[in-house]
Amino acid sequence: MAKNSRSPWIAKNLQRLLNVGLIMLAAILVVFLVKETIHLGKVLFLSNQETSSYMLIEGIVIYFLYFEFIALIVKYFESGYHFPLRYFIYIGITAIIRLIIVDHENPIDTLIYSGSILVLVVTLYLANTERLKRE
C-alpha cells in the first residue's frame, strides 16, 4: 500500500526533473543557434567563393538541425509531455542529408544514405496515416 501512494510522487518529481533538463537543453540549443547564425553570416560575407558555398550549405543544414531540436522540445510541452515520432524522423532525414553533403566521396555510401532517407520518408508516410496518427 505504501508503494502505491509513493508512485505518483515519484512520477511527478521525475517529470519535473525531465522538464528542467529539457528547458536547459533548449537554452543551450538556442545559444548554439545564435552562434550558427553568426557563423553563417561570416561564411556568407567574409569567406572566399570556392569554400563558402559548401560551408554555407553545411551551415544551413546544421542550423535546421538546431531548429528542429528546439521545435521538438516545444512540441513536447505543447502535446502534454509527449515526443511525436514524426519530429524524430524529420531530424533523422535532415541529419542524413547533412551527412551526404559533407561526405559524398564514396558513391556506395551516398546510395546507402539515400536509401536510408527513403526508408525514413516511407516511415513518415506510414506514421501520418489515419490508423497510426495520435495527435
From Swiss-Prot:
Topological type in the membrane: Multi-pass membrane protein
Keywords, comma-separated and alphabetical: Cell inner membrane, Cell membrane, Membrane, Transmembrane, Transmembrane helix
A single GO cellular-component term on record: plasma membrane
Biological processes, Gene Ontology terms: cellular response to phosphate starvation
A Pfam family that the UniProt record links to this protein: PsiE
Stored InterPro entries: P_starv_induced_PsiE, P_starv_induced_PsiE-like
Localization, UniProt: Cell inner membrane
Family, similarity comment: Belongs to the PsiE family.
Protein name: Protein PsiE homolog
Gene that encodes it: psiE
